[in-house]
């Protein structure tokens, strides 16, 4: 190998390392901001990270472990995988990976695959039943492990897709919440990747070379409604760059007085002569003011205040 080739290889390696460092910092920042905005993790928490073997959950676990090293509070992490007994599932991959990184883990074996195949007719989607079964098992496991938070790997794109799924097929303005409490009040579920782009997660997963396990039960089903919505959003993103970011911002800027749900806003109670603080009234007749700024902002150039010493300020329990 001549000197010019060696120099070119060195420059390429430096560029790859630089880009990976930027990507990791962006994911750390987005996860840290989501944790802070929604008070997802507090001092003394035991976070159960649900690991499926897909790119999202691997990235979630990796970033949380990374943040844990510099967090100003103490919290524990335990990784949990639900082995659903799908035919051909490589049972050795996750235990070997988790042992290699030295994280506490538990593999839960439940034949939900057999139940789903028995209950759901051939050709029908299995997602709904499979999801309910998994949820019950994971809630039970969290209780057994003494986990105070259950972390799932859903990201920003998942939340947007769910919003449109519910509008198109369910007639509801509803998405995935970044944080929720179970119906019985015993479990808190968090989604620390809520601010993360799927594109970033995909790149990070490839760079880290996670041992990905495909979901043959879900991913192989044709004509899923979620896949239709995903492709629609991807098309919009190609045709109108920046629209995905704008739509996600809309989920964080909701004006209840300009929707049509009387259970959330007292339309009947509006009387002439009233002046309501914080409610847009005749502004509704004005032409919308669109800020004159680029649709896409380079996230690497954004400045975010992480508190003292550049660390994310997790809320501490008093």
UniProtKB/Swiss-Prot annotation:
Sequence motif: PP-loop motif, positions: 52-57
BP GO terms, sorted: tRNA thio-modification
Superkingdom field: Bacteria
Binding site for [4Fe-4S] cluster: 127, 130, 218
Cofactor annotation: Mg(2+); [4Fe-4S] cluster
Keywords for the protein's UniProt record, in alphabetical order: 4Fe-4S, ATP-binding, Cytoplasm, Iron, Iron-sulfur, Magnesium, Metal-binding, Nucleotide-binding, RNA-binding, Transferase, tRNA processing, tRNA-binding
GO molecular function terms attached to this record: 4 iron, 4 sulfur cluster binding; ATP binding; magnesium ion binding; sulfurtransferase activity; tRNA binding
Listed Pfam families: ATP_bind_3
Cofactor note: Binds 1 [4Fe-4S] cluster per subunit. The cluster is chelated by three Cys residues, the fourth Fe has a free coordination site that may bind a sulfur atom transferred from the persulfide of IscS.
SUPFAM superfamilies the record matches: Adenine nucleotide alpha hydrolases-like
Subunit relationships: Homodimer.
Family designation: Belongs to the TtcA family.
The protein's role, per its UniProt record: Catalyzes the ATP-dependent 2-thiolation of cytidine in position 32 of tRNA, to form 2-thiocytidine (s(2)C32). The sulfur atoms are provided by the cysteine/cysteine desulfurase (IscS) system.
Extra remark beyond the main annotation: The thiolation reaction likely consists of two steps: a first activation step by ATP to form an adenylated intermediate of the target base of tRNA, and a second nucleophilic substitution step of the sulfur (S) atom supplied by the hydrosulfide attached to the Fe-S cluster.
Protein name, as recorded: tRNA-cytidine(32) 2-sulfurtransferase
Species of the source: Actinobacillus pleuropneumoniae serotype 5b (strain L20)
